């Protein structure tokens, strides 16, 4: 130990008399093994200089006794002898020991409690010789076993020279107070090989692996001098081995070199330990490990005391979200050095543009393979400080610099320069322009010219135990020589201006629990070789003015070096920043215990990386395979991680940081409640839906108290009103006014309110659809052909519909929706789109027939209708009571109708395209695109209103709450017939059309509910397929009695409603796809939307201004937009396209071209068959033929195609897209409008 005294048993009891034999006894094998396990003592070779008159060696005298005064005198004078103990470290092969027995383990544990930790991972711990003997008096059962190993041999000095003997620090020795001189004894060191008694005793060499030259026993150690090289061997030495030429009376605990690295508390402790004489009290080398020497980069460098402390306060090893910032050493306009942010990572890399100093677009970081190898070598040889307990940047920088000195990366004279460089001011692109513009990659010559012509006085405020440089460094160390104004250069000072220029928008994109990583790289002229340090703090701390946003810092990486080497510091900084942004690597960085764990994580990163050959890439098409190859590597990487998690789980333990992942997505997660799962009991699914959904009824009302719900009501109101007006006008045309806009608005309002209050999924929007419009027209033609009352027949169809719905729900038949694949959905949507397009041009053809283009129009008698039309050609006359024919042969009517139809279509279509453009902001584009239909209707109505001398047919809307044709019907439809009795056979035969309309309602409602209930949409309150189908079917029977149209769940409007109530996460990395935070599931918005649609009946005067040609344009828009999201239409275009221009889609790359075209032709054949049926008198049967496509897909197609091909051609892989620049609902859905 430092004073070289044996502690008495009990700590304060008198020291016993120690008998030291003059002859060296033979060592038994057991004694040699114990000495080898306990370590070699650190011999001091120059202790003989302190002895003026050594006693004569008497071989006949067996032993002598030492008193307490001898020990006290030796303890006092031994403090002023400088012996660098780092030159006596054990060799490398002695550092690895065999597993000790329980007794040896106990002694080694006591010994480690008296030893300070090494400063870095690469430095082995200092082991003191005789350390185990310090505890021999504490265990009585060990005295006999340790007695032989504690003997000391005395060798006679050469004649004619002063005695030069060695003693072991902490060995048994004594001094006689009356002697003029004092003999020094040394404990023999057991050698590894065969032992020779005549061979000189060799001590342990340097701790550095590169210099382990053995020291001769009598060699004189070199005293420390300012000009000597201050390396690891001279740094790691106890205070008792420091030279002091002032004599024993000078009260100096240590030299300046060690004092400048220690705090005041450590210096006071050293003074009390080394200079105060407390008799009977044994003091150790260092009471507690120094902060500088207690590097966290080594597992074995922690004493048991620290291990117990860390066990009480374990650092947080749970992985957090990451924010990485790269700062480079730059020069501002005044040629002053500062740290400048050049890139940042949340998930993807964002670089600062050179000229404009603004952030570029996020992109995947591309790294050079050489920079990764250099980074691996840097971490392997640099400093690694893990779980560093510091809370300020000056404290962290001080320990980083000291560790660099200890690990021989920088010289001691560069301490102040490196420290001041680390504490320079940090500037960011969002800050004020006080930092000025800077060159992105300044040349090394310019940096060296500036850094070589400046001078700085290092000074910074004290931080706890970190000494002030002005007090402890003496003369100021030059950082930039020859600069008298360097004292005013800004440094990083705590409590300054704080985070200037914070980007609140960026802060919103960073997760709340994120911890930052700061990367500092740059060139400096005063270093001869690169110096690096990887730091992980024990807990995240908020460092003022370092980051552009106030995010706590957990990791730091420092890389400084000269400019004359070939290392690209910018690329090396990008490499470590990209690694820290990688999910698996930063998890490994949190859990790493030493640098080997970091190196292993780099190897894992390299295993999942892609190396692109150094060849020119002419276009993006040449890089198509890179994305697919990367996805394959990521899949294998996830499989390896999953395998590791499973192995650790089976082994009975979990790796650090894996507990949360298993809790969230592990095998122990609760199974999900499948609403389509059959219970086996009658109405079992309906009961489950009621129990699942109705308990959330109070929250369905509370969750509506948000401003987002108000905005959704206004938006969906126009989205629901536009189809109601469009389909109402077309329905009035098909049914000759028996049902029109009034009936459809009332039906939408009543059924919407009831469904929102009672439905299991209140986010569904019920409304009229294209398939129901086709069925209503087919059923009307059927009734006309059979001379039946259309409205009375609908009453009996509605009653049978209720019966069939009850039977289907009671048998839990909703599970059949699983068998409806995209094969059937695409056929259904494609057919309805074709019908919409055909009906649009057919209506336009009728307009041109009634109002042909003539070379001459007669002046008189041009109007064949009512006289009122002559007075107001384009006015809004009240609807006729009887139904006279409208005017015919009107000039310019056909052309104006064509203009209105195409104008409405083009405006709505291009506003939809504008939604996905780059103009304006994302929210503004989305609002404009979503309101495209109302905007186009409004503009074309204004155009028609401004042309007063041209006739156009207007929408027929009654005044007030009235039916469309009061002279034809009333609000209540008698089931037995109004004009004549309804035939009884038709009452029974109505079951057939009821079954057909059930097929349409079932497909649209259940598929819509299935789309809304996708896992990706994050609906938490559940759905109810049985309850929703029962409500819509039962309300359909009610609609028949009042002559209202049947409704179903409208797919596009329902998805739009859910998207409007979806709350997206703001903490999304730039460039990453948006993620759903929550969906406001409630019932109030549906009730308000339906109520507002019902109140629109009072706008009859406004609705009567809408020309039918405008509705034809909306009809055309619905048909065209529905085709854009269907895969069938895309594959249809591929038939006319060469194979080399086919897109990179699974149905192209995984299926042969001719087999893909065969699948497309089968779908086209089904569509043609349905079109033929729809065009004949048997048009009512088209829903039944549509249902037959389900068994066709399940039974016939597997015989023609392989499962792999069907998976590519008929897979439901569409996910909701919430990106502001993404596609709209029409592109995501395979269902008709």
UniProtKB/Swiss-Prot annotation:
Membrane topology: Multi-pass membrane protein
Region (Membrane (anion exchange)): 710-1233
Pro residues composition-biased segments: 1-11
Gene3D superfamilies tied to this protein: Helical hairpin bin, Mannitol-specific EII, Chain A
Gene Ontology MF term list: chloride:bicarbonate antiporter activity
Ranges of Basic and acidic residues composition bias in the record: 58-73, 268-290, 482-500
Residues with a covalently attached lipid (S-palmitoyl cysteine): 1166
Cytoplasmic face residues: 1-709, 912-926
Extent of Acidic residues compositional bias: 137-153
Listed GO CC annotations: plasma membrane
Residue numbers spanned by region Disordered: 1-320, 431-500
Biased composition (Basic residues): 74-97, 104-113
Residues with PTM Omega-N-methylarginine: 296
Reaction(s) catalysed (UniProt annotation): hydrogencarbonate(in) + chloride(out) = hydrogencarbonate(out) + chloride(in)
Annotated transmembrane regions: 710-732, 738-775, 795-817, 827-848, 894-911, 927-947, 981-1003, 1029-1050, 1084-1129, 1156-1192
Keywords assigned: Anion exchange, Antiport, Cell membrane, Glycoprotein, Ion transport, Lipoprotein, Membrane, Methylation, Palmitate, Phosphoprotein, Transmembrane, Transmembrane helix, Transport
Highest taxon listed in the record's lineage: Eukaryota
Subcellular location: Cell membrane
Modified residues (Phosphoserine): 168, 171, 176, 199
Family from the record: Belongs to the anion exchanger (TC 2.A.31) family.
Name of the protein described by the UniProt record: Anion exchange protein 3
Lineage: Eukaryota, Metazoa, Chordata, Craniata, Vertebrata
């Amino acid at each position: 130990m430092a004073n070289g005294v044996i502690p008495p048993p009990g700590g304060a009891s008198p020291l016993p008399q120690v008998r030291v034999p003059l002859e060296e006894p033979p060592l038994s094998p057991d004694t040699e093994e114990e000495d080898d396990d306990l370590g070699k003592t650190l011999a001091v070779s120059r202790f003989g200089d302190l002895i003026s008159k050594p006693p004569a060696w008497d071989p006949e005298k067996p032993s002598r006794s030492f008193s307490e005064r001898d020990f006290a005198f030796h303890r006092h004078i031994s403090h002023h002898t400088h012996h660098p103990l780092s030159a006596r470290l054990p060799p490398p092969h002695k550092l690895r020991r065999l597993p000790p027995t329980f007794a040896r383990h106990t002694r080694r544990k006591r010994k480690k409690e008296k030893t300070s930790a090494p400063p870095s991972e690469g430095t082995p711990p200092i082991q003191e010789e005789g350390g185990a003997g310090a505890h021999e008096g504490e265990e009585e059962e060990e005295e006999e076993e340790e007695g032989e190993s504690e003997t000391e041999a005395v060798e006679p000095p050469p004649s004619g020279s002063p005695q030069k003997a060695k003693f072991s620090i902490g060995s048994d020795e004594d001094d006689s107070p009356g002697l003029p001189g004092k003999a020094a004894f040394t404990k023999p060191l057991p050698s590894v090989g065969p032992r020779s008694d005549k061979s000189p005793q060799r001590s342990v060499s340097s701790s550095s692996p590169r210099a382990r030259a053995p020291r001769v026993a009598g060699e004189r150690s070199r005293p420390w001098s300012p000009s000597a090289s201050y390396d690891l061997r001279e740094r790691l030495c106890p205070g008792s081995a420091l030279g002091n030429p002032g004599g024993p009376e000078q009260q100096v605990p240590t030299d300046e070199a060690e004092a400048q690295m220690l705090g005041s508390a450590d210096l006071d402790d050293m003074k009390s330990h080394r200079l105060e004489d407390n008799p009977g009290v044994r003091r150790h080398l260092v009471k507690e490990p120094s902060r500088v020497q207690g590097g966290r980069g080594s597992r074995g460098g922690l004493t048991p005391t620290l291990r117990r402390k860390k066990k009480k306060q374990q650092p947080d090893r749970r992985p957090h979200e990451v924010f990485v910032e790269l700062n480079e050493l730059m020069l501002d306009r005044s040629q002053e050095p500062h740290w400048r942010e050049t890139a940042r990572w949340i998930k993807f890399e964002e670089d600062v543009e050179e000229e404009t100093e603004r952030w570029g677009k996020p992109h995947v970081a591309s790294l050079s393979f050489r920079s990764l190898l250099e980074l691996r070598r840097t971490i392997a040889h640099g400093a690694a400080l893990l779980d560093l307990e510091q809370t300020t940047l000056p404290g962290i920088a001080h320990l980083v610099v000291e560790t660099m000195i200890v690990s021989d990366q920088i010289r001691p004279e560069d301490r102040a320069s490196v420290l001041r460089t680390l504490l320079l001011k940090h500037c960011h692109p969002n800050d004020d322009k006080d930092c000025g513009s800077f060159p992105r990659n300044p040349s090394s010559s310019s940096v060296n010219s500036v850094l070589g012509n400046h001078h700085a006085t290092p000074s910074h405020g004290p931080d706890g135990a970190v000494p002030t440089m002005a007090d402890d460094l003496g003369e100021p160390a030059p950082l930039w020589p020859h600069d008298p104004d360097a004292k005013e250069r800004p440094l990083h000072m705590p409590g300054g201006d704080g985070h200037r220029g914070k980007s609140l928008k960026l802060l919103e994109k960073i997760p709340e629990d994120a911890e930052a990583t700061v990367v500092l790289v740059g060139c400096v002229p005063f270093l001869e070789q690169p110096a690096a340090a990887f730091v992980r703090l024990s807990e995240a701390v908020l460092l003022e003015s370092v980051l552009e946003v106030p995010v706590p810092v957990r990791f730091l990486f420092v890389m400084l070096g000269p400019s004359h080497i070939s290392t690209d510091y910018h690329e090396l900084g990008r490499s470590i920043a990209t690694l820290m942004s990688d999910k698996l690597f930063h998890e490994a960085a949190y859990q790493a215990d030493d640098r080997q764990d970091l190196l292993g994580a780099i190897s894992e990163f390299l295993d999942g990386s892609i190396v692109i050959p150094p060849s020119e890439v002419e276009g993006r098409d040449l890089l198509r395979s890179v994305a697919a190859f990367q996805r394959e590597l990521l899949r294998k990487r996830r499989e390896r991680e999953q395998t590791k998690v499973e192995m650790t789980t089976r082994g009975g333990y979990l790796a650090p940081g894996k507990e949360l992942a298993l809790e969230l997505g592990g095998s122990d997660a609760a199974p999900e409640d499948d609403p389509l799962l059959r219970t086996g009991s009658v109405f079992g699914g309906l009961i489950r839906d009621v129990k699942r959904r109705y308990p959330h009824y109070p929250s369905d009302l509370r969750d509506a108290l948000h401003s987002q719900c108000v905005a959704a009501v206004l938006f969906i109101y126009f989205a629901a009103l536009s189809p109601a007006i469009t389909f109402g006008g077309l329905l009035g045309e098909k049914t000759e006014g028996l049902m029109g806009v009034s009936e459809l608005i009332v039906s939408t309002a009543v059924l919407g309110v009831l469904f929102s209050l009672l439905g299991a999924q209140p986010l569904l929007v019920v409304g009229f659809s294209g398939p129901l419009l086709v069925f209503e027209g087919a059923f009307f033609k059927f009734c006309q052909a059979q001379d039946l009352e259309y409205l009375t027949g609908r009453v009996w169809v509605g009653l049978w519909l209720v019966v069939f719905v009850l039977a289907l729900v009671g048998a839990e038949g909703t599970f059949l929706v699983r068998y409806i694949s995209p094969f059937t959905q695409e056929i259904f949507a494609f057919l309805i789109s074709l019908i919409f397009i055909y009906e649009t041009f057919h209506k336009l053809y009728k307009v041109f027939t009634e109002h042909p283009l003539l070379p001459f129009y007669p002046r008189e008698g041009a109007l064949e209708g009512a006289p009122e039309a002559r007075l107001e050609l384009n006015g809004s006359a009240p609807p006729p009571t009887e139904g006279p024919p409208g005017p015919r042969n009107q000039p310019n009517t056909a052309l104006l109708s064509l203009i209105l139809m195409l104008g409405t279509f083009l405006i709505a279509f291009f506003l939809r395209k504008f939604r996905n453009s780059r103009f304006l902001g994302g929210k503004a584009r989305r609002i404009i695109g979503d309101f495209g239909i109302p905007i186009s209707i409004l503009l074309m109505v204004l155009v028609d209103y401004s042309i007063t001398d041209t006739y156009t047919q207007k929408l027929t809307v009654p005044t007030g709450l009235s039916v469309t044709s009061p002279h034809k019907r009333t609000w209540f439809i008698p089931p037995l017939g109004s004009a004549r009795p309804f035939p009884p056979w038709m009452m029974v035969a109505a079951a057939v059309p009821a079954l057909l309309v059930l097929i349409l309602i079932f497909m649209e409602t259940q598929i819509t509910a299935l789309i809304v209930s996708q896992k990706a949409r994050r609906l938490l309150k559940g759905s109810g397929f049985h309850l929703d189908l029962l409500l819509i079917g039962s309300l359909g029977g009610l609609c028949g009695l009042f002559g209202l149209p049947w409704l179903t769940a409208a797919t596009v409007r329902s998805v739009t409603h859910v998207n409007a109530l979806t709350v997206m996460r703001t903490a999304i990395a730039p460039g990453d796809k948006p993620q759903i935070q929550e969906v406001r599931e409630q019932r109030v918005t549906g009730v308000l939307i339906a109520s507002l649609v019902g109140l629109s009946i009072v706008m009859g005067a406004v609705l009567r201004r809408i020309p039918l040609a405008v509705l034809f344009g909306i009809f055309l828009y619905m048909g065209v937009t529905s085709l854009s999201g269907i895969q069938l239409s895309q594959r249809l275009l591929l038939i006319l396209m060469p194979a080399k221009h086919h897109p990179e889609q699974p149905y192209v790359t995984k299926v042969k071209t001719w087999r893909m075209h065969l699948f497309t032709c089968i779908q086209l054949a089904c569509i043609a068959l349905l079109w033929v049926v729809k065009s004949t008198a048997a048009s009512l049967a088209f829903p039944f033929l549509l249902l037959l496509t389900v068994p066709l897909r399940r039974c016939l197609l597997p015989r023609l195609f392989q499962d792999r091909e069907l998976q590519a051609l008929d897979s439901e892989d569409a996910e909701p897209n919430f990106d502001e620049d993404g596609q709209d609902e029409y592109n995501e859905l395979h269902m008709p409008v």
